[in-house]
């Protein structure tokens, strides 16, 4: 919490000299971190480890050329999965002409212009503009501009993209049907809800991304669906036409995987988008795709084109300095910038794709050029550049109408995600089949596969360490009270060289030789430190020094330092982790495993009684880590338990609580969590071990009905397992804080201490 640094400073000032003696704990080596801030160093080291893994990822990637014959099909299915292209399209309906352009006919030399719409998913359409040649050649081009380019600008109806407009008009004049698809842009006017009167400065693409990512969808994937829905409609009309796809900037980010997934697209051209993706974490968050760098990268995606054409232009893409500036009532957007890619790196990525493509594609036409002018003819053949302006039969306010179209398309995406959220409970139950498992009598065994899926597919597994720690834990004494002694302890993390686990260890005095006591691992929250929970000299805000209080009662306590500290310095860790299939909790889980292994070596510790108790972000840890690490014999979630998926995706949250759609905590979303594990399902992975929720009525993290709704599903499963006493919830009149009443009784009951 915010007062953590001040609290620790007061501790140093007020404590007698003997508390600050540097004596290490028996069985450990002396403290080596000196006066450096361990939490800041931890975050820094994790960042270094992630950048190393990102750099190594392309070299460890597998490609279709090195796998079995049907690997293209498997890889396409996997690419569709991580991009959220998983909903069956309607498969019916034509491209239809709609107003406003239909009511104000626009004619040009050799072609006419129409506003068009086509079906994609139920209650979700694609829209754009069509340049219809008067003498068609049988060629069709689908064009995606950069996110901030209106289709009207791309064809020259309004200023802004004159060079591109000249090329597209020339293409239409030469007989090619040109469809310019409307994209979700980077403004923020519609990023929020007029119903509840809350808004953010998140770009529209980020606003859609946040809610969609949690439900296993993606703004990129939705736009791929719109492209492929258009292809569906065109092919129904004429199976023999040749369809090409071109994308500029953000449009290129969509065009490459769209073409990779659909063989009906004969050729794809990309401008200002094709690049290495190892630094995607520094770009806008709506480009974040789970495991994309590990499994694909742009080179790997290009290989899925097989023997179809690819044209890459290294013309500079969009330059974006960040999200819209925060202003009153609008804040919370994630940082991220876009700029030109180095030509040598783009060319190297192109050459990697050339090298890795399947043998049958060796003769496919793949072209790289420095600018659009160099490669445009390679893509479309000789075409004129038509700079004359089309004429309109009546004036139209095209910009205002274009923005209304944009908001309509964006609202459809948001509505689709809200529908997925409403259906998510049924989806998760179908996968988990909790009631049937409860009746099977093999709960622990049957849930092991789900536990592995949670670790590997949702949290991200760092894997097994390459060896045991080569160094012992290091420590220094920081507390010496009448009831207990405290040390800061640091230990290596073998699975991530250079990264360490660290915390405060409290050992009660008076433990008899041969006596073994339970341990309670007490976890701080956001921007917190172990001293917030373990400080014996003052009653800390929110935490009420609950770790120190437990130590006074005779429990052995360990208070870990978790790496969610430093604002964007830690949030960017999630950005670096996701592209290689990891998350912040990948490291937290590994750190807790090391801590537990160390605790089990201590002669005073009963390794069968290792409990977890965390507040706020520590409550998030209480849901995730014990679900994976079965060495924890019980878990208590305080000031965090929720209908977690709704808290992340609700555009119009009910009740007065904090929804992550409207905060700067952009690291909260976890890919496809909404279809796999809400808090009930996480608690089911903890079962049959004891599990408890501590909930203050005034805690703004949620509202009581939401908390009770989600908890009821847990209580039902424990009841069906015939262990209803193993789970409890305590509501109390208070806020975001540790109460330490029912929870302390819960610890005493299940740890059987004090006797």
Spans of model-derived segments:
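Alpha/beta-hydrolase-fold serine-hydrolase catalytic core, especially in secreted/extracellular enzymes
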Residues: 22-126, 136, 207-223, 228-232, ...
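Alpha/beta-hydrolase-fold catalytic nucleophile elbow
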Residues: 182, 271-272, 313, 561, ...
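Cap/lid segment of the alpha/beta-hydrolase catalytic domain
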Residues: 138-235, 273-286, 512-601, 648-656
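Loop/turn elements at helix/coil->beta-strand transitions in domains of secreted/extracellular proteins
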Residues: 138-139, 174-177, 240-242, 263-267, ...
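Bacterial N-terminal signal peptides that target proteins for export
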Residues: 1-8
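Cleavable N-terminal signal peptides
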Residues: 9, 19-20
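Primarily recognizes the serine-hydrolase "nucleophile elbow" in alpha/beta-hydrolase
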Residues: 229-304, 597-665, 671-672
């Amino acid at each position: 919490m915010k007062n953590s640094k001040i609290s620790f400073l007061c501790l140093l000032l007020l404590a007698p000299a003997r508390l600050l003696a540097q004596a290490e704990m028996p069985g450990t080596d002396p403290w080596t971190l000196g006066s450096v801030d361990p939490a800041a160093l931890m975050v820094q080291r994790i960042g270094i480890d992630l950048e190393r893994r990102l750099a190594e990822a392309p070299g460890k990637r597998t490609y279709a050329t090195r796998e079995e014959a049907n690997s293209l099909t498997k890889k396409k299915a996997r690419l569709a999965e991580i991009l959220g292209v998983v909903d069956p399209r309607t498969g019916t309906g034509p491209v239809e002409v709609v107003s406003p352009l239909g009511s104000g006919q626009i004619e040009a030399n050799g072609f006419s212009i129409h506003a068009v719409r086509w079906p994609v998913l139920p209650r979700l359409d694609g829209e754009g503009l069509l340049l219809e040649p008067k003498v068609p050649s049988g060629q069709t081009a689908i064009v995606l501009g950069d996110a901030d380019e209106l289709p009207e600008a791309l064809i020259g109806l309004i200023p802004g993209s004159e060079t591109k407009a000249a090329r597209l008009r020339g293409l239409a004049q030469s007989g090619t049907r040109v469809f310019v698809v409307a994209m979700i842009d980077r403004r923020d006017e519609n990023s929020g809800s007029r119903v509840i009167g809350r808004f953010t400065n998140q770009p529209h693409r980020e606003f859609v991304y946040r809610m969609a990512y949690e439900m296993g969808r993606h703004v990129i994937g939705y736009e791929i669906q719109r492209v492929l829905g258009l292809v569906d409609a065109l092919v129904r009309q004429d199976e023999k036409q040749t369809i090409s796809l071109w994308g500029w900037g953000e449009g290129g980010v969509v065009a490459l995987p769209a073409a990779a997934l659909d063989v009906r697209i004969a050729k794809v051209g990309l401008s200002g988008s094709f690049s290495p993706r190892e630094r995607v974490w520094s770009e806008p968050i709506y480009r974040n795709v789970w495991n994309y760098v590990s499994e694909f990268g742009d080179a790997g995606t290009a290989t899925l084109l097989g023997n179809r054409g690819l044209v890459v232009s290294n013309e500079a893409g969009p330059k974006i300095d960040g999200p819209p500036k925060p202003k009153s009532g609008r804040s919370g957007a994630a940082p991220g910038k876009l700029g030109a890619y180095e030509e040598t790196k783009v060319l190297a990525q192109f050459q990697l794709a050339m090298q890795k493509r399947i043998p049958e594609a060796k003769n496919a036409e793949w072209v790289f050029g420095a600018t659009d002018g160099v490669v445009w003819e390679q893509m479309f053949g000789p075409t004129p550049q038509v700079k004359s302006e089309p004429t309109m039969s009546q004036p139209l306010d095209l910009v205002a109408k274009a923005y209304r179209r944009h908001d309509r398309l964006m609202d459809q995406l948001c509505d689709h995600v809200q529908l997925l959220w409403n259906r998510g409970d049924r989806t998760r139950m179908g996968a988990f089949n909790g009631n049937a498992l409860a009746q099977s009598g093999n709960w622990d065994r049957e849930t092991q596969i789900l536990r592995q899926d949670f670790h590997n597919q949702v949290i991200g597994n760092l894997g097994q360490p390459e060896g045991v720690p080569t160094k012992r834990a290091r420590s220094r004494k920081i507390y010496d009270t009448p009831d207990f002694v405290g040390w800061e302890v640091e230990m290596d993390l073998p699975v991530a060289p250079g990264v360490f686990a660290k915390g405060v260890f409290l050992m009660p005095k008076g433990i008899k030789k041969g006596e073994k006591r339970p341990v309670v691992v007490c976890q701080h929250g956001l921007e917190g430190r172990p001293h917030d929970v373990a400080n014996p000299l003052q009653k800390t805000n929110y935490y009420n020094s609950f770790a120190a209080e437990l130590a006074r009662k005779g429990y052995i306590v360990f208070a870990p330092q978790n790496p969610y500290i430093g604002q964007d310095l830690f949030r960017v860790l999630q950005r670096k982790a996701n592209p290689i299939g990891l998350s912040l909790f990948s490291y937290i889980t590994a750190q807790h495993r090391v801590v537990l292994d160390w605790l089990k070596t201590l002669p005073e510790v009963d390794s069968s009684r290792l409990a977890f108790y965390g507040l706020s972000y520590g409550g998030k840890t209480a849901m995730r880590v014990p679900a994976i690490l079965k060495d924890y014999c019980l878990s208590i979630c305080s000031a965090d338990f929720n209908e977690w998926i709704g808290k992340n995706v609700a555009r119009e949250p009910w009740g007065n609580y904090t929804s992550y759609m409207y905060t700067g905590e952009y690291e909260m979303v976890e890919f496809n969590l909404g279809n796999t594990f809400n808090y009930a399902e996480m608690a089911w992975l903890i079962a049959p071990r004891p599990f408890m929720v501590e909930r203050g009525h005034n805690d703004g993290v949620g509202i009581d009905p939401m908390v009770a709704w989600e908890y009821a599903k847990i209580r039902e499963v424990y009841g069906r397992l015939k262990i209803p006493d193993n789970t409890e919830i305590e509501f109390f009149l208070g806020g975001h804080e540790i109460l330490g009443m029912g929870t302390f009784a819960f610890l005493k009951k299940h740890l059987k201490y004090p006797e």
